[in-house]
């Protein structure tokens, strides 16, 4: 067994390589390094066996059993493995799983190949994560969080992108030095420190009119963030402060309701407004983010959080696809939640909103929601769950960083007595 420090390209990311009497297995980390191990009878290896190999190789404490899990991850699908799952056989069924749980074309499925990834356990509660002090654990959590930021899954306040880029620069580029760190250095590396939607140039007539700002605004703000945090650690050895910096990065993300979530491909219907005839598509492509505290919906085109609802305010139900000869129907998840709404007369009333979220992965979404809620119920009754989950997060904390954008979704409204207000 050896630890691979080099980065891997997508073509090199192969989980299993068969040998005459054994199986070569590669387990990847979110920092693009991997652990390569040769196993006798590797075809029969369970996720729990491979998990222990990672703990040993990385020098992680046994308590990490709750913090991390093994996943099969590809551009099309992400699956958390249970302890008794056998990854080799899961990979053999990958085309079938992608056909069932994604809307990908046959050639996309044929070209898709999963990697075995060691990453955060979706059932590990954020309330327990904030107490972690072990540097190696924080490092792994940091790299996964950074991945989610750069992939555009974690939608943040604009100023925080620069702060996080400054922390990342201090960790990877060392302290700011005016001789070495010039504006061109930052401009050439934007894609490694920011999600695309932050630095990409808008297109179209309306976009050009909105983007009348200094061209170097992002580079300059990143440079300033790097310089500022470097000044804070001016007299410190950065290598001795890495654990503190990993934690500092994570602290900016913990308040967001989607932190630590599993992300599912989905879409919702657009509301039909006065200019509805101009819209080319009636759907909004979304991420549905589900964690131990609630459900979030993220607009993937506009990179904004549309909805964040804690389980304390949520009801849900699976909807079978309504097959139509001329329509490729999708299963869906019905999300029902309470909101305060003002009538045209200015009177505030309590109503129920229902949103349909369409996804090939709807059954997986429902299963994850119900598993998270069931674990919380067991804990409240004093019964330890298989994956330990802390108590409910308060609804105010869940909403702290996000404002629900109800007007941007196609919602059905009911009164508390059950009357449909859309009719």
What residue ranges belong to the model's regions?
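Classical protein tyrosine phosphatase
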Residues: 46-71
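Acidic, Ser/Thr-rich intrinsically disordered and amphipathic helical segments
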Residues: 46-53, 137-144, 313, 364, ...
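Eukaryotic mixed-charge, acidic/polar low-complexity intrinsically disordered regions
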Residues: 2, 60-64, 74-113
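C2 and C2-like phospholipid-binding beta-sandwich domains
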Residues: 89, 99, 103, 117-119, ...
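N-terminal recruitment modules of adaptor/scaffold proteins
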Residues: 2-14, 19-34, 147, 153-156, ...
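Short, contiguous acidic and Ser/Thr-rich linear segments
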Residues: 29-52, 309-310
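Elongated alpha-helical scaffolds
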Residues: 110-126, 136-144
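Short, conserved secondary-structure transition motifs
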Residues: 71-79, 169-174
